[in-house]
Amino acid sequence: MKKMRKQTGFTLLEVMVVVVILGILASFVVPNLLGNKEKADQQKAVTDIVALENALDMYKLDNSVYPTTDQGLEALVTKPTNPEPRNYREGGYIKRLPKDPWGNDYQYLSPGDKGTIDVFTLGADGQEGGEGTGADIGNWNIQDFQ
């Protein structure tokens, strides 16, 4: 006697229904994830700017002045010359300069246009001004991005 085996598995129709349902779910989830990426990039910029500002404050505590605009943020990593700081810490104030979340260098002005010093990123567009992801984020407006 031959036994008949029952075949198990999914029909093509069942697989197609699952694919359609997954597509519908993805249409709701993906836009939310993209918005979170933009927010995460802005939060990283805020965190970096606060850390750079703290390192600059430590530099000023040791040397009585902030680095000049020409010396830039690089003065936090390697000892600047002309003018040479009086009490520069061995090893610097940070190990390396971070890039902003969009791969650009952070900007630094001393004296600043918005305060004693300005530390900022030009945002995703790399241009002054802008809105949304292209907005400039600086130590003068970080509260707007928290």
Curated annotation (Swiss-Prot):
It is found in: Cell inner membrane. Residues 1-9 form a propeptide. One of its GO terms (cellular component) is type II protein secretion system complex. Keywords: Cell inner membrane, Cell membrane, Membrane, Methylation, Protein transport, Transmembrane, Transmembrane helix, Transport. The modification N-methylphenylalanine is found at residue 10. The keyword Cell membrane applies. Its main location: membrane. The keyword GTP-binding does not apply. InterPro entries: Bac_GSPG_pilin, N_methyl_site, Pilin-like, T2SS_protein-GspG_C, T4P/T2SS_Core, Type2_sec_GspG. One of its GO terms (biological process) is protein secretion by the type II secretion system. Cleaved by the prepilin peptidase. Induction: By cyclic di-GMP and VpsR. It is a single-pass membrane protein. Type II secretion system is composed of four main components: the outer membrane complex, the inner membrane complex, the cytoplasmic secretion ATPase and the periplasm-spanning pseudopilus. Forms homomultimers. Interacts with EspL. PANTHER family: GENERAL SECRETION PATHWAY PROTEIN G, TYPE II SECRETION SYSTEM CORE PROTEIN G. NCBIfam families: IV_pilin_GFxxxE (TIGR02532), typeII_sec_gspG (TIGR01710). Belongs to the GSP G family. Core component of the type II secretion system required for the energy-dependent secretion of extracellular factors such as proteases and toxins from the periplasm. Pseudopilin (pilin-like) protein that polymerizes to form the pseudopilus. Further polymerization triggers pseudopilus growth. This is Type II secretion system core protein G.
